[in-house]
Amino acid sequence: MASSCLLLACVVAAAMVSAVSCGPPKVPPGPNITAAYGKQWLEARGTWYGKPKGAGPDDNGGACGYKDIDKAPFLGMNSCGNDPIFKDGKGCGSCFEVKCSKPEACSDKPVIIHITDMNTEPIAAYHFDLSGHAFGAMAKEGKDEELRKAGIIDMQFRRVRCKYPGETKVTFHVEKGSNPNYFAVLVKYVGGDGDVVKVELKEKGSEEWKPLNESWGAIWRIDTPKPLKGPFSLRVTTESDQKLVANDVIPDNWKANALYKSEIQVD
């Protein structure tokens, strides 16, 4: 009886080892991609998700908190990034040139994408899970569907400065649930670095800049026992320490779930 139990245990253990070893090996993430823009192309793997010609998520959102990423200025040219690209939300809004030369459907011509979401699949040191639209944009003319059928491809990328049309300014969305004691804001359409590492708030008549805490994605928040009084000015710091000040951008009669456009943008 004991030998039978031992045999059974050995079989189960062998099955467990076999199950663990199945599938492609996990690849550790590479070093974080910073705002040091260079000409060198780096290797990555590319996949796509969502509808074949869509913007990625079914709700046109994603882990950065952006909304309507199918519309201008993103226009569906979006991607998830793995850890060294998404950087726990601090990579949200950053821009990359991406291209592929294989399979045959690839054009080898770079297109620009925005980081709007995250992925955690350990298939490469750098992994872009692009929208169906962005993935197809790397293809030769008329071969986008053929390229999407490839599924997983080797691709090249490099960080670039974000450039928005002249009428696009840094925009703030006051999140649902915000009130005088809790203020949460989504920051989007930041040119240059694209990503934000610090947000501060100054009340009308005050000289104090109060730091906000990163909530998730591109959303920042502040909790305060003393009610905040508008209008508010917001100061945004990008990864390369460029500071942008939007004076009185949030009016004194501000509302939750509302969009406020500034007059500022990175040159």
UniProtKB/Swiss-Prot annotation:
Which is a Pfam family this sequence falls into?
DPBB_1
Question: Which superkingdom, per the lineage?
Answer: Eukaryota
Q: Gene3D superfamilies this protein is in?
A: Expansin, cellulose-binding-like domain (2.60.40.760), RlpA-like domain (2.40.40.10)
Q: Which residues form the signal peptide?
A: 1-22
Its Gene Ontology biological processes? plant-type cell wall loosening; sexual reproduction
InterPro entries per record: Expan_Lol_pI (IPR007118), Expansin/allergen_DPBB_dom (IPR007112), Expansin_CBD (IPR007117), Expansin_CBD_sf (IPR036749), LolPI (IPR005795), RlpA-like_DPBB (IPR009009), RlpA-like_sf (IPR036908)
Q: Please name the SMART domains in this protein's record.
A: DPBB_1 (SM00837)
Which residue positions carry a glycan here?
N32, N213
Expansin-like EG45 domain residues are 61-167
Domain Expansin-like CBD residue range list: 181-262
Q: Where in the cell is it found?
A: Secreted, Cell wall; Membrane
Q: Gene Ontology terms, cellular component aspect?
A: extracellular region; membrane
User: PROSITE patterns annotated for this entry?
Assistant: EXPANSIN_CBD, EXPANSIN_EG45
Q: Disulfide connectivity?
A: C64-C92, C95-C162, C100-C106
Listed A to Z, the keywords are:
Cell wall, Cell wall biogenesis/degradation, Disulfide bond, Glycoprotein, Membrane, Secreted, Signal
Major subcellular location class: secreted
Topology relative to the membrane: Peripheral membrane protein
Name the family. Answer: Belongs to the expansin family. Expansin B subfamily.
The free-text function statement in the UniProt record for this protein reads: May cause loosening and extension of plant cell walls by disrupting non-covalent bonding between cellulose microfibrils and matrix glucans. No enzymatic activity has been found. May be required for rapid internodal elongation in deepwater rice during submergence.
Q: What is the recorded name of this protein? A: Expansin-B10
Q: Which species is this UniProt entry from?
A: Oryza sativa subsp. japonica
